[in-house]
Amino acid sequence: MTQDVSPIITSLLDTDAYKLHMQQAVYHRYRNVSVAAEFRCRGDELLGEYAGEIANQVNLMGQLALTQDEYDYLAALPFFQRDYLDWLRTLRLDPRRVAISNDRGRLNIRISGPWREVILWEVPLLAVISEVVHRHRSPHITPEVAAAQLQRRLSEFRHLSADVDLRGFHLIDFGTRRRFSRAVHQAILTTLKSEFPYLSGTSNYLFAKQMALTPLGTQAHEWFQAHQQICPVLANSQRAALQSWLDEYPDQLGIALTDCITMDAFLRDFGSQFAGHYQGLRHDSGDPIAWGEKAIAHYEQLGLDPQDKMLVFSDNLDLPKALALYRHFHHRINLSFGIGTRLTCDLPGVRPLNIVIKLVECNGKPVAKLSDSPGKTICQDAAFVKALRKAFDLPLVKRAS
């Protein structure tokens, strides 16, 4: 099967920017922390038949290494320190850390080991799963088909937005993890760069480098989840995560993710010092209008001008949804819109995969994500979910999944 031989992932930079940002912080602060992460398919699809092909790709990823050209690119950015980049240059992903099996048709994947290494598996592995599955299901889809579909979407957007001043509309490509394929991803970004003046950048470091785009991203749920076990007092864990991030990046990468333990619990921890230092907030679950109103009200209650802050929306967006949010908020606060699947897997007759890889353990103990959307809650340990809800004064209503 020659189609299995060619590697899908050919660069360590073919990942989301925040993975490298978080990895540097982990390297500096939590070098000896161990974690485990697991794959989840939120739908009812049986993907186990692809386990062998995915495992072949994982083995190929063990050959990846940072090139001198890539090292020089990262070194020229303001985020990275030389000690981290020197270590990253020596890093080789270890496929033995990734356990893959076909469990009666279900795809099971568990990644375990040092956090500083495990952290790099999630995004490229999800991209591999998506590309392998779509390669079998929709072999007729080409990058040209994707570009033509995007042109139709952009035409619709121009029509819908004809009456709006879009100078404050900022689109970010968040499409790596559930893209149809790398070739489709590249075609989408090429089209956006030439046809859409409101593209601010991409979360993908490889394409940012190759296409002279701005790389964008800060931190993910796993940063907050791991602190649930790193921090000695569970109730202080979210504040500890926020402070540790500021210690690593005091003057940059200042967008905070709010929904690891619900927006309400986040805002209780996000006092005037954090709100003043952080540039803004990212929405990833729950009602985006209600969330944005809470964020603006919180800034105002703290005496901070919302027009000095940024809201980043990234939950299941497409261009019409982003435009609706822009209409609602753009006179009151700065806005960016991270669109992923609806850019890089928006194709005729193709159903995108609803797949994630999330942290489930840190230092051998459970961690949880209690998002603002019940279906996105992740934890296998009901007792820990109960303890987390008690620590953050949340009602004991949502069942862990």
Curated annotation (Swiss-Prot):
Phosphohistidine PTM positions: 221
Swiss-Prot/TrEMBL catalytic activity: nicotinate + 5-phospho-alpha-D-ribose 1-diphosphate + ATP + H2O = nicotinate beta-D-ribonucleotide + ADP + phosphate + diphosphate
PTMs per UniProt: Transiently phosphorylated on a His residue during the reaction cycle. Phosphorylation strongly increases the affinity for substrates and increases the rate of nicotinate D-ribonucleotide production. Dephosphorylation regenerates the low-affinity form of the enzyme, leading to product release.
Keywords noted in UniProt: Ligase, Phosphoprotein, Pyridine nucleotide biosynthesis
TM region positions: none
Pfam family, one: NAPRTase_N
A single GO BP: NAD biosynthetic process via the salvage pathway
CDD domains: PncB_like
The protein's annotated pathway: Cofactor biosynthesis; NAD(+) biosynthesis; nicotinate D-ribonucleotide from nicotinate: step 1/1
EC number: 6.3.4.21
InterPro entries: N/Namide_PRibTrfase, NAPRTase_N, Nic_PRibTrfase, Nic_PRibTrfase-Fam, Nicotinate_pribotase-like_C
GO cellular component: cytosol
Gene3D superfamilies linked: nicotinate phosphoribosyltransferase (3.20.140.10)
GO molecular function: nicotinate phosphoribosyltransferase activity
Described purpose of this protein according to its UniProt entry: Catalyzes the synthesis of beta-nicotinate D-ribonucleotide from nicotinate and 5-phospho-D-ribose 1-phosphate at the expense of ATP.
Family in the record: Belongs to the NAPRTase family.
Protein name: Nicotinate phosphoribosyltransferase
Organism: Edwardsiella ictaluri (strain 93-146)
Organism phylogeny: Bacteria, Pseudomonadati, Pseudomonadota, Gammaproteobacteria, Enterobacterales
Gene: pncB
